[in-house]
Amino acid sequence: MTETGELPSDLAGMQRYVDAWIRERGRYWTPLSQFARLAEEVGELGRELNFRFGDKPRAAKDEPGSVTDELGDIFFIVLLLANDLKIDLAGALAATVQKYGQRAGS
């Protein structure tokens, strides 16, 4: 993929991969800047979903976007933010799934 090698398929490996990638190219942005970028990307995803499935027609000047690309952008920034804040996303996801499972069982 890049000089960092192939993208791992496990979440912890993805976090390490993105950490190596960002360090090769510079540094992490501040957490607040990362959050602002995340909000921007979520907005772009929302815009594309609204064009595709909502009531807002796409204007002639609006190029079709890619839901896949927008989700990839969001995931990349989530990985960056988690790394910067020293959060194990696999552990966070496991806790969230357990929490939702308990809610569904109630």
Regions of interest found by a model, annotated:
Residues M1-L71, F75-S106:
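Flexible "arm" and connector segments at domain edges
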